[in-house]
From Swiss-Prot:
One matching Pfam family: ABC_membrane
Keyword vocabulary terms for this entry: ATP-binding, Cell membrane, Chloride, Chloride channel, Endoplasmic reticulum, Endosome, Glycoprotein, Ion channel, Ion transport, Isomerase, Membrane, Nucleotide-binding, Phosphoprotein, Repeat, Transmembrane, Transmembrane helix, Transport
The keyword Glycoprotein is annotated on this UniProt entry: yes
Keyword Plastid: no
Reported modifications of this chain: Phosphorylated; cAMP treatment promotes phosphorylation and activates the channel. Dephosphorylation decreases the ATPase activity (in vitro). Phosphorylation at PKA sites activates the channel. Phosphorylation at PKC sites enhances the response to phosphorylation by PKA.
Organism: Xenopus laevis
Segments traversing the membrane: 79-99, 124-147, 197-217, 224-244, 300-320, 341-359, 861-881, 924-944, 996-1016, 1019-1039, 1101-1121, 1136-1156
Annotated function: Epithelial ion channel that plays an important role in the regulation of epithelial ion and water transport and fluid homeostasis. Mediates the transport of chloride ions across the cell membrane. Possesses an intrinsic ATPase activity and utilizes ATP to gate its channel; the passive flow of anions through the channel is gated by cycles of ATP binding and hydrolysis by the ATP-binding domains. The ion channel is also permeable to HCO(3)(-); selectivity depends on the extracellular chloride concentration.
Name recorded for this polypeptide: Cystic fibrosis transmembrane conductance regulator
Amino acid sequence: MQKTPLEKASIFSQIFFSWTKPILWKGYRQRLELSDIYQIHPGDSADNLSERLEREWDREVATSKKNPKLINALKRCFFWKFLFYGILLYLGEVTKAVQPLLLGRIIASYDRDNEHERSIAYYLAIGLCLLFVVRMLLLHPAIFGLHHIGMQMRIAMFSLIYKKTLKLSSKVLDKISTGQLVSLLSNNLNKFDEGLALAHFVWIAPLQVLLLMGLLWDLLQASAFCGLGFLIILSLFQARLGRMMMKYKDKRAGKINERLVITSQIIENIQSVKAYCWENAMEKIIETIRETELKLTRKAAYVRYFNSSAFFFSGFFVVFLSIVPHLLLDGISLRKIFTTISFSIVLRMAVTRQFPWAVQTWYDSLGVINKIQEFLQKEEYKSLEYNLTTTEVAMENVSASWDEGIGEFFEKAKLEVNGGNISNEDPSAFFSNFSLHVAPVLRNINFKIEKGQLLAIAGSTGAGKTSLLMMIMGELEPSAGKIKHSGRISFSPQVSWIMPGTIKENIVFGVSYDQYRYLSVIKACQLEEDISKFPEKDNTVLGEGGITLSGGQRARISLARAVYKDADLYLLDSPFSYLDLFTEKEIFESCVCKLMANKTRILVTSKVEQLKKADKVLILHEGSCYFYGTFSELEDQRPEFSSHLIGFDHFNAERRNSIITETLRRCSIDSDPSAVRNEVKNKSFKQVADFTEKRKSSIINPRKSSRKFSLMQKSQPQMSGIEEEDMPAEQGERKLSLVPESEQGEASLPRSNFLNTGPTFQGRRRQSVLNLMTRTSISQGSNAFATRNASVRKMSVNSYSNSSFDLDIYNRRLSQDSILEVSEEINEEDLKECFLDDTDSQSPTTTWNTYLRFLTAHKNFIFILVFCLVIFFVEVAASSAWLWIIKRNAPAINMTSNENVSEVSDTLSVIVTHTSFYYVFYIYVGVADSLLALGIFRGLPLVHSLISVSKVLHKKMLHAILHAPMSTFNTMRAGRILNRFSKDTAILDDILPLSIFDLTQLVLIVIGAITVVSLLEPYIFLATVPVIVAFILLRSYFLHTSQQLKQLESKARSPIFAHLITSLKGLWTLRAFGRQPYFETLFHKALNLHTANWFLYLSTLRWFQMTIEMIFVIFFIAVSFISIATSGAGEEKVGIVLTLAMNIMNTLQWAVNASIDVDSLMRSVSRIFRFIDLPVEELINENKNKEEQLSEVLIYENDYVKKTQVWPSGGQMTVKNLSANYIDGGNTVLENISFSLSPGQRVGLLGRTGSGKSTLLSAFLRLLSTQGDIQIDGVSWQTIPLQKWRKAFGVIPQKVFIFSGSIRKNLDPYGKWSDEELLKVTEEVGLKLIIDQFPGQLDFVLLDGGCVLSHGHKQLVCLARSVLSKAKILLLDEPSAHLDPITFQIIRKTLKHAFADCTVILSEHRLEAMLECQRFLVIEDNTVRQYDSIQKLVNEKSFFKQAISHSDRLKLFPLHRRNSSKRKSRPQISALQEETEEEVQDTRL
């Protein structure tokens, strides 16, 4: 970044912002990059600002312990500068009130009785022009200074909130949703940036009104208050319209949220949507919601339109009501008329715009400050103190809960019970109504391990394994008992966390660098081969969340980070997730057992082979210690431990049915305490009154729940995953929006708060920060492609040598040469690479083609043109009124002069005769009435048509996205796509229609005023032409740079929130490693990068505003002197010319800003058009109409063979020379694969992590760019439509897709099957008993991706879809990866019966799941080898033989089992299910 010229700029350059000219010229000539942006001033750096505010906040907390106020800390930091710029702003506003006085004196000097003052008219004109210059020199620096202070306040509070976030306790994090936190940083704090300039008008506007009313009293006496009274009534009317608009906005919020939730789910699971051929069904569902949303959008738009148009047309009535009473009583002069008009313009702005906006700004700002103040006082994390004298880790009778403390609970309970009129004397009331709060996650835990021992912790999902580790780290505070441990802790989380940076930086993580230790850890964690394949080895830069890595690679890097740190205690929470058998066994042996042999280790695992090698085994069951001791003691004392470990005693229907009790605990109550109490007390599915009978929603079963139910107030719908309080309309109205353009994976997508589609309960699953920390957000589907497109940075490449583990890597003395501290200073180039951004490279300005496509997108374009002409004629009628006044006023002047009317009290020309007065009065009233009739309603068709255009564009974009090839989604993030449906669609719905209307109206007002001025004084037209030309050239010159600066600001905005989300996901790791200062530095760097862009944008914008005003001042000087020099004795002509010139000056400047805003908003339209123009997959058979497509069955008649045959009939599959890549022309991921499958054959697909198993299944469905040929029952995929081909397959994907909607819709979105058929299939797959428990059964609405269902139940839903499809080929992608044994047995049973005649292709890591397969395909090096039996496979592939356990080998080789039958039998121990990331997501930690 370049050094800012502001530091060396002169006072003149700073006042006129001419120091920005170099960047403006550079942006006009070429494309700007981040390197072209100027460095920030040290006073604007996040470090300095946050330090100042933090110091003052700490002082406030120390001095006001009971009730510290954040606003007091802000005052001490920014008050005096804020006051100084407020005074400048007031002085600038005062000049507006003085200008009409000089205008009146100029008009008066042209009266025939004041000819002696004619000579001073030029001096008065010079004074009037000087007032414009003074106003310009006062207002623009004041506005810029206030924007600057607002920016500094936002930065300081940004940093303060981030620092506080890193200190929050886990209990607090469990109560705060990610959306609330991001909304606090984005929507709320943005109000300071530009809103602060309006804050002073809360006192400036009243003073302005007092001054103006005093001056108007001097002119019109009491009649002046008539106009003021009208303005006050108008303000109240606008306030009423504002409340109506908020009502429509609130109603619309639910529909917008519903649409975005389903849209995000579709985008997130687009591969499943295409595999199921659900594109048309999903499009119909979303368009139905969109129709209801647009009805409310139109109502809100009409109200906003009337609110806006009322301001434009109020000017006539203010002048009319002020002048007419005075005219009727005393008569009036033209000087008074024109002076009153000028005063009324200023008065109208102060009363109807400035003061209400200022009040709203203070209301919003104080609300935000109170929110932040409350946030800063929340409970902080307290690290567990350790005893250096002890050498062991021990727990004595430890209990803990993620809920509130017992004391807090009873205080709240008493308050709630008293509020509900329940007797305090009944102690059972507490436990019957509030049992949810006190259920501990851990109870009476006792164990002790000595230094150097390995403790293995096992248990079922939700047993409390991770909570136990959190308690050792201090994240969970024990409610009873004692914990002892010594020294430093290293931690490997179950959800692998990757920070933005190189692979080496992720592993070293700020610890002193030792090459020998580093290489040893790399080898032990099986990372050598993976790193060697990266283009820059371990210096490859990893993006957000490790998006360029596979799940297994992320898990191994996360483990390597923990192992590299020299600690006294290592906490390893299920570190082997998503690892294949061979890799898992090697890492456990070489790393956990050998490399860390002398360290104290606590390993969470459920593998029996690993339990055997542990020194001690601790088995948890429902939060209690089920067993503690050695493994041999476990076999002797608890031979049935395997079933307890898994969490299911029996596989009978009753036990399977009780699973629903567990899965229904995943909602948090979102209502008032009384609702909570009634919900718990009744223990029933209570519905609200206005439910319809067709749709049901989520339920809450609170019985026996050990999960957290938090009492929360209702929040607004969450938008774009990060906004829970503000709607997109509000977002679009701000010039600055810190909502990230590219959100991070799944965490960025909106979570379902509620769906107003029918019955709903007052419950929802809250996406808390703690949930975010215990889940993964990176889709596994695009790993292979993303790896090949990793952003890299060139650094020195380490040589990897074969390191032995003979030496203890932790006890070596490090030489000075080998120590390398990770620097706290982060280079901006590194920052750009760490936070990968896919922002489009758009042209600096919106092209005319975009405008043309936008206006012609709807058939009502001709009506838009007609109404534009109506607008023009109305403006001409308004301007013509002034000419009528002039023409009819001349006879009146002569009449009063000749008749020497005695009633005249002054010497000025006065309208007093009945003829002249009534004539002019009727003309004015007639013109005003026509303006009211034509003006107020003239824009409605325009607004209506533009909203219809938005509807058409949304429909086209949705269709294009759903039918785009998968290669589009492999190169585009889900967050970017969702932004088009949320942010950009909101702009089209809410802001763009009224912005276009305002711009059209302002331009025509200016044209009308210029026309009148030119007719009166033709010489003025000569001065108007160069002004208009200068305006057009200056606008074009500025737009080239400003739009690029906005793009750069948007790019710089994303890393701020990406870093926040990254920090939240890895917060436990950050605390365990003590790297909070490093991440604060990284956050400040991201803030500074954004500040540099935003400050430069504000500076260039202010330069543009000042330059325009300078041009207008020159124009007004020319108009003034031309009119004075050529007017002779006509005061009326001078008055009209100067009044309209002032009006032109204000209106044209407004129009310039409006044109820039419209151009900026049209960029959203341009982005939508680029999505509409996306390439389309092979088109569906166009000969069929839409109804036939929607109702089409999943079995097709083969038009290519015989009409009487059904295709597919057998399921025979032949693959010939199949090659595949993710994008056209990209690297080949599968090459020349050929094999054939017989009908009904079961085939197992094997391979290491990332070998391409899922890729091959995707290639079968034509989801990739493929070459070669596949035939099913003799029909080639090249001769059949794409959707027909896909419907030949039944699919159970690795990533389960449940969209928000009824169970019926999730099973049969096309509505083809009857209830009897659907219930029969659900019973067949084991879902019937669960569905029967839901109110409404098939009509029960699943929210938030089916949060009330376990992952196993979701798999069964997918299985039911496949059964309904009647497909002949079934593809299963890792179906047992996340399943409990019950669900796995159900799937195996269903495969035997429902798919007995089908060809089954099963992709699995575990050999146990493949025992029933007849053939096997092993993927190695992008090719496939076939094996006829698993025995042959194990014999030829030695690493498979090494990876499987002894018990599995007994299953695979029955001959070996018979030969060893004489040996002493031992209790059979089945392999324990490995916990995975998806299961952890379902636990409440």
